[in-house]
């Protein structure tokens, strides 16, 4: 963003006065960013925002959103995407929150004829893709790290359970059929961990 935007927002975010969320994933395209169908259409000195974003982390609690929207071109135009600062309480913003499998709460957010002033544009028009690309790489690796960590904990707990849970007087871990299943899950975990480390090294 501009120096004025940084001066206005960064101290408030760092100080905890403002909680933000990044809304860029869409239902039909997921991480295919160029396929963004949310639009910000010029209207007078500002814009009118329409569209939907899904799986917005912190979306339920956030009071401001950074939203990626198309300001020019079509789905084949990578240079027509821009970022906007949107008040989450503005007229036309509607949230639906839900819990993911790991318990984290996320939100789907729709924008219907949301009026934005000219200074809501974050940075330059058409400059969103480079910023979002970099953040997406980090986000995907972070999510993978979380998933691999959860997988490791669950495997360890399951292995411990097979050693202490008895059936017919012996630990269930002594049964070959269960041992085969545990080996499969451990192999999947080690493979996932190796892929995560490879992604971290290459990134």
Q: Which residues does each predicted region cover?
A:
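Residue-level signal for inorganic ion chemistry
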Residues: 2, 51, 84, 109-111, ...
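Short Gly/Pro-enriched turn/cap motifs at secondary-structure boundaries
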Residues: 28-31, 55-58, 74-75, 98-105
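A short core secondary-structure module
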Residues: 23, 52-94
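Glycine-rich beta->alpha junctions and the first turn(s) of the following alpha-helix
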Residues: 93-190
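Short beta-alpha junctions and helix-cap segments that line functional grooves
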Residues: 9, 36, 52-54, 95-98
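A short, Trp-centered hydrophobic/proline-enriched beta-strand micro-motif
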Residues: 16-25
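A structural signal for short hydrophobic beta-strand segments in well-ordered beta-sheet cores
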Residues: 38-41
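N-terminal glycine-rich flavin-associated loop
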Residues: 1-4, 30
């Amino acid at each position: 963003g501009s120096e004025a935007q940084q001066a206005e927002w960064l101290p408030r975010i760092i100080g905890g006065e403002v909680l933000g969320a990044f809304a860029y994933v869409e239902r039909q395209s997921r991480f295919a960013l160029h396929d963004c169908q949310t639009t910000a259409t010029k209207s007078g000195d500002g814009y009118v925002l329409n569209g939907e974003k899904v799986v917005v982390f912190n979306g339920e609690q956030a009071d401001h959103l950074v939203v990626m929207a198309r300001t020019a071109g079509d789905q084949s135009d990578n240079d027509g995407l821009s970022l906007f600062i949107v008040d989450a309480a503005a007229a036309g913003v509607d949230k639906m929150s839900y819990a993911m499998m790991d318990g984290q709460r996320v939100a789907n957010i729709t924008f219907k004829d949301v009026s934005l002033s000219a200074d809501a544009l974050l940075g330059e028009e058409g400059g969103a893709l480079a910023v979002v690309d970099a953040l997406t790489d980090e986000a995907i690796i972070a999510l993978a790290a979380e998933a691999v960590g959860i997988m490791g904990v669950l495997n360890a707990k399951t292995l411990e359970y097979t050693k202490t849970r008895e059936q017919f007087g012996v630990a269930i871990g002594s049964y070959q059929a269960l041992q085969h299943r545990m080996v499969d899950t451990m192999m999947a975990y080690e493979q996932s961990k190796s892929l995560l480390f490879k992604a971290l090294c290459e990134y």
